[in-house]
């Protein structure tokens, strides 16, 4: 549920998300469906392998708004 992004600690962006996944700090990942699959695909695979739930969001703009930023976001995550 996107509203979780406004009430929990989060990270926004592919680079930060990759680091947090590697460190085991993510509780849930959000991926924009209109983002480049070359960027989001490896993240989805990592989440699947590590048991981190993934929620798909229709657009980068919608994900960016949910994160409280004025630009689109390809990926975001809730932190543990």
Task: List the predicted regions and their residue ranges.
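Ribosome large-subunit tunnel/peptidyl-transferase-proximal elements
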Residues: 1-25, 36
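C-terminal structural segments of small proteins and small subunits
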Residues: 7, 50-80
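Short secondary-structure boundary/capping segments within folded domains
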Residues: 19-22, 45, 67-68
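Short, flexible micro-motifs
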Residues: 16, 27, 67, 71
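Short aromatic/hydrophobic contact patches that present stacked aromatics
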Residues: 28-30, 75
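Amphipathic, hydrophobic secondary-structure cores in small proteins
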Residues: 28, 37-55, 62
């Amino acid at each position: 549920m996107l509203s979780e992004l406004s009430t929990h600690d989060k990270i926004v962006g592919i680079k930060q998300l990759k680091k947090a996944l590697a460190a085991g700090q993510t509780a849930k990942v959000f991926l924009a469906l209109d983002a480049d699959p070359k960027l989001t695909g490896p993240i989805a695979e990592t989440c699947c392998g590590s048991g981190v739930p993934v929620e798909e969001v229709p657009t980068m703009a919608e994900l960016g708004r949910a994160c409280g930023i004025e630009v689109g976001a390809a990926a975001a995550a809730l932190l543990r």
